[in-house]
Amino acid sequence: FLPIYSKLKTQNGEVLAFIYFKKVLYRVVFSLFILMIIFQITMPFIIHFLAPGFLNNQNVVEQTTTLSRITIIFMPLISIVAILGVATNVSGKFWVLAFTPTILNTSIIIGCFFINDYWTIKSLPLAIATVFGGLIQIMFILIMIKKFQIFEFNDLETKNYFKKENKLIKFEINQTWKKFLPAAFGGGILQINLLVDTILASLLGFGSISYLYFADR
């Protein structure tokens, strides 16, 4: 996505690159929200598969399902952050995307102060803080995009370009998906390894998945 967007911006102008950027963003966000809804519905089955060691404690299964349904909302949010970050990086504002993890970490740290016996699930504030962190990250990048005037076009400009360059935009979008699949497959290999680790860790003592996560970090 980044090389194609950068190429269009350099060779075909900012307006055409913006149209391509917007179309890819909309399609990715739509796909991820559909996927998130599917995960929300099927989360109990996913937890049974990912953490078979929890099945002997129904309370843990229910709490894990609740927390997972909240934190899965972060998936489309961080994807939006990554795509918006492409625009800031190509414009030379590398620090903007690099700063966003600080926002998430700060949100989670603040969430730690709300952990107490009031909550049925004590780690619930952390799950909520993760989602809030993602939302704040998006707002931060959008503010920076506005501040640095990365996308400053009127509707007439974009409509005229879209009519003239519709075939080129479609071609580049198709190229994006073709290049996305091999990259997703490569990343999927790592995720399979983490998946197996999680399944095995769930069969060990309480907190093993957390220990594995922190060790990996």
Residue locations for each model-derived region?
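Membrane-embedded alpha-helical bundles of multi-pass transporters/translocases
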Residues: F1-R217
